[in-house]
């Protein structure tokens, strides 16, 4: 079974068209100004129209206030809100009530002890995104090109639905799928030639590997 594939940090029509054509289930736009993948909501809204109906549009925010969320929801019309900051369970409930949209909560993972951070959000978040904890000194909560020990996820309750993120690329995606029960994969830096610059050849290479894996015994 082919996992969901979310390509995050899209900024151009060419890369958006390519990931949708190759079969991305989700396309992510980042609304965090410190990120090299940041995009203005009005531009993201125009790009999102090209993906509408073919892939789910995900708005990625980091501790955004209501005014900014209002702008994003109005201009982008996302299918999903991804909260990648320190938003509390109460904040998630408030956001879900305000916008009536599914919420994916990002949880930063370095070791097994970090899995405990998932528990307070169970029953509130519609899905989780398990990302590698940012290296010391990084201003970015995600997109740092680092991964974590995926074997620690074996202890995670099977009821927890999650996308796996952090340092994924064509060279390790098969291992990630074999080692975890992730229902989806989230990539950003793994399909880039430079921070914030998506590479069409890397996008193609990644989808080639995923498609080959999905056809094999493990994906049958």
Swiss-Prot record:
- Record-linked InterPro entries: Aldolase_TIM, PRAI_dom, RibuloseP-bd_barrel, TrpF_fam
| Protein EC | 5.3.1.24
Establish whether keyword Amino-acid biosynthesis is in the entry: yes
**What are the alphabetically sorted keywords of the record?**
Amino-acid biosynthesis, Aromatic amino acid biosynthesis, Isomerase, Tryptophan biosynthesis
GO BP term (any one): L-tryptophan biosynthetic process
Q: Reaction catalysed by this chain?
A: N-(5-phospho-beta-D-ribosyl)anthranilate = 1-(2-carboxyphenylamino)-1-deoxy-D-ribulose 5-phosphate
Q: What class of enzyme is it?
A: isomerase
List the coiled-coil residues.
Answer: none
CDD domains for the chain:
PRAI
Q: Which GO terms describe its molecular function?
A: phosphoribosylanthranilate isomerase activity
The intrachain disulfides are: none
Q: Which family does it belong to?
A: Belongs to the TrpF family.
Report the protein name in the record. N-(5'-phosphoribosyl)anthranilate isomerase
Q: Which organism is it from?
A: Agrobacterium fabrum (strain C58 / ATCC 33970) (Agrobacterium tumefaciens (strain C58))
The coding gene here is: trpF
């Amino acid at each position: 079974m082919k996992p969901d594939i979310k390509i995050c940090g899209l900024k151009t029509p060419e890369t958006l068209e390519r990931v949708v054509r190759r079969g991305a289930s989700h396309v992510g736009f980042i609304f965090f100004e410190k990120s090299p993948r940041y995009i203005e909501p009005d531009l993201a809204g125009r790009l999102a129209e090209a993906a509408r109906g073919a892939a789910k549009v995900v708005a990625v925010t980091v501790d955004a206030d209501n005014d900014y969320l209002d702008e994003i929801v109005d201009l982008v019309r996302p299918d999903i809100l991804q909260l990648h900051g320190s938003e509390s369970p109460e904040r998630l409930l408030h956001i879900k009530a305000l916008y009536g949209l599914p919420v994916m909560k990002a949880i930063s993972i370095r070791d097994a002890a970090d899995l405990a951070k998932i528990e307070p959000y169970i029953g509130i978040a519609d899905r989780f995104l398990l990302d590698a904890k940012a290296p010391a000194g990084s201003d970015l909560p995600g997109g740092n090109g680092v991964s974590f020990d995926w074997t620690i996820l074996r202890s995670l309750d099977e009821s927890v639905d999650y996308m796996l993120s952090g340092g994924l690329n064509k060279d390790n995606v098969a291992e990630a799928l074999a080692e975890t029960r992730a229902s989806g994969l989230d990539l950003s830096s793994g399909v880039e030639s430079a921070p914030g610059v998506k590479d069409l050849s890397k996008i193609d290479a990644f989808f080639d590997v995923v498609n080959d894996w999905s056809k094999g015994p493990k994906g049958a």
